[in-house]
A protein has these predicted regions:
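A beta-strand signature from Gram-negative outer-membrane beta-barrel systems
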Residues: 108, 120-160
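Transmembrane beta-barrel wall of Gram-negative outer-membrane proteins
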Residues: 158-160, 165-196, 200, 204-242
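Non-catalytic regulatory/gating segments with a bias toward low-complexity or hydrophobic composition
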Residues: 48, 56, 67-68, 126-131, ...
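N-terminal Sec signal peptide and the immediately downstream disordered periplasmic leader
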Residues: 1-59, 65-72, 178
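Short acidic/polar hinge/loop motifs at secondary-structure boundaries
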Residues: 70, 98-99, 104-130
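Extracytoplasmic beta-strand/coil segments of soluble accessory domains associated
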Residues: 65-106
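Soluble periplasmic/extracytoplasmic beta-strand elements of cell-envelope proteins
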Residues: 29-33, 47-52, 82-84, 98-102, ...
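Membrane-embedded beta-strand positions in outer-membrane beta-barrel channels/transporters
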Residues: 29, 80-82, 125, 145, ...
Length: 244
């Protein structure tokens, strides 16, 4: 059955900046931190694929399955990732991943959780490093590493609300509010609510199969002065799904 999807987006920004220069048509430079320092992707001596926020939006990347279509030599399953054939052998106790996953530089024990957090909404950049990365990333990175870099709070007053509706009662709502609190302190709140009715009818008293409900709330706080920057990020997520 054809799936119908409608997208409504509302963006509220305190100011708009327009460039007087026309688009030169050149290739946009992507800055990555794969080598623990900021550098152009063209100057990075690692086999890497990177998605900045504009590319994530243009390709409509919302989950790990979407990512797999654009990453060479990579296989992604619901909770695991393999690069060049190297991944997790088994998920039982002691089954360490072969590809390390990081969110803002912090190690994540589960790729599935990190890659579905916020539906890749409000993500600044995604970096996929292919090949052994033990020198910079330590254990569990013999196959490669994946970095998710989220957007940080800033001194810009801005907000956005975005909704998507479709068949089977599918509805998704995304939104954020970024606001300065003082000259040195700012906060960013992100809310994502996604859900869909089941696609397989349950003839009993239970819910239809393959339905899901996902609620995700994030608070990001940044304090900075001329010499130091401190970022604090907290996340609360509730996810439920009726498996078929």
């Amino acid at each position: 059955m054809k799936k119908l999807t409608y997208i409504i987006s509302l963006s509220l920004v305190s100011f708009f900046a327009f460039s007087d220069d026309e688009d030169s048509g050149g290739i946009e430079e992507v800055i990555v931190t794969a080598e623990r320092q900021a550098s152009s992707i063209q100057d990075t001596a690692i086999s890497i694929t990177a998605f900045d926020e504009n590319l994530i939006e243009d390709l409509n990347l919302r989950n790990q399955e979407d990512l797999q279509n654009y990453i060479p030599a990579t296989t992604i399953q619901p909770y695991d990732i393999s690069i060049r054939g190297i991944g997790r052998m088994f998920r039982a106790l002691g089954g360490d991943p072969g590809v390390g996953t990081y969110v803002d530089g912090a190690y994540s024990v589960d790729f599935g959780i990190a890659s579905t957090d916020n539906g890749l909404y409000d993500v600044e950049r995604i970096e996929i490093l292919r090949g052994p990365q033990g020198t910079l990333y330590g254990r569990n990175s013999i196959g490669g590493a994946v970095n998710f870099i989220t957007k940080k709070a800033s001194q810009v007053q801005e907000a956005e609300i975005r909704t998507i509706v479709g068949s089977y009662g599918m509805s998704e709502a995304y939104g954020f509010l970024n606001t300065p609190l003082t000259d040195n302190l700012s906060a960013r709140v992100i809310a994502v609510n996604r859900g869909r009715d089941g696609t397989i009818k349950d003839l009993g008293a239970g819910d239809d199969l393959d339905s899901y409900q996902d609620e995700n709330y994030t608070l990001s706080i940044r304090w900075e002065n001329d010499n130091h920057t401190l970022d604090i990020r907290g996340n609360e997520r509730s996810y439920g799904r009726v498996l078929s």
